[in-house]
From Swiss-Prot:
<dbReference type="InterPro" id="IPR038662">
    <property type="entry name" value="ATP_synth_F0_csu_sf"/>
</dbReference>
<dbReference type="GO" id="GO:0005886">
    <property type="term" value="C:plasma membrane"/>
</dbReference>
<keyword id="KW-1133">Transmembrane helix</keyword>
<keyword id="KW-0472">Membrane</keyword>
<comment type="function">
    <text>Key component of the F(0) channel; it plays a direct role in translocation across the membrane. A homomeric c-ring of between 10-14 subunits forms the central stalk rotor element with the F(1) delta and epsilon subunits.</text>
</comment>
<dbReference type="InterPro" id="IPR000454">
    <property type="entry name" value="ATP_synth_F0_csu"/>
</dbReference>
<keyword id="KW-1003">Cell membrane</keyword>
<keyword id="KW-0812">Transmembrane</keyword>
<keyword id="KW-0446">Lipid-binding</keyword>
<feature type="site" description="Reversibly protonated during proton transport">
    <location>
        <position position="57"/>
    </location>
</feature>
<keyword id="KW-0813">Transport</keyword>
<comment type="similarity">
    <text>Belongs to the ATPase C chain family.</text>
</comment>
<dbReference type="GO" id="GO:0008289">
    <property type="term" value="F:lipid binding"/>
</dbReference>
<keyword id="KW-0138">CF(0)</keyword>
<feature type="transmembrane region" description="Helical">
    <location>
        <begin position="5"/>
        <end position="25"/>
    </location>
</feature>
<comment type="subunit">
    <text>F-type ATPases have 2 components, F(1) - the catalytic core - and F(0) - the membrane proton channel. F(1) has five subunits: alpha(3), beta(3), gamma(1), delta(1), epsilon(1). F(0) has three main subunits: a(1), b(2) and c(10-14). The alpha and beta chains form an alternating ring which encloses part of the gamma chain. F(1) is attached to F(0) by a central stalk formed by the gamma and epsilon chains, while a peripheral stalk is formed by the delta and b chains.</text>
</comment>
<keyword id="KW-0406">Ion transport</keyword>
Length: 74
């Protein structure tokens, strides 16, 4: 029974990886919308874009690691 609950928890934590992908898409879409409105400011904002993508992707990686820990360590 405890093993089954670990797999359910791992599945729920694994959904965080997909949600992080949605977050990365949202960051990129908003950057593109802003860059199309003001092309002269787009070049100075690319570093901010990459930082935002890195933070969103880091949350996905952390949720993936939690899922792996729940599956194999618990």
């Amino acid at each position: 029974m405890e093993g089954d609950l670990a797999y359910i928890g791992a599945g729920l934590a694994g959904m965080g990886t997909g949600i992080a992908a949605l977050g990365v898409g949202n960051v990129a879409a908003n950057f593109l919308a802003g860059a199309l409105r003001n092309p002269s400011a787009a070049a100075s904002q690319t570093a901010t874009l990459f930082i935002g993508i890195a933070f969103a992707e880091a949350l996905g990686i952390f949720s993936f690691l939690v899922a792996l820990l729940l599956m194999f360590a618990v």
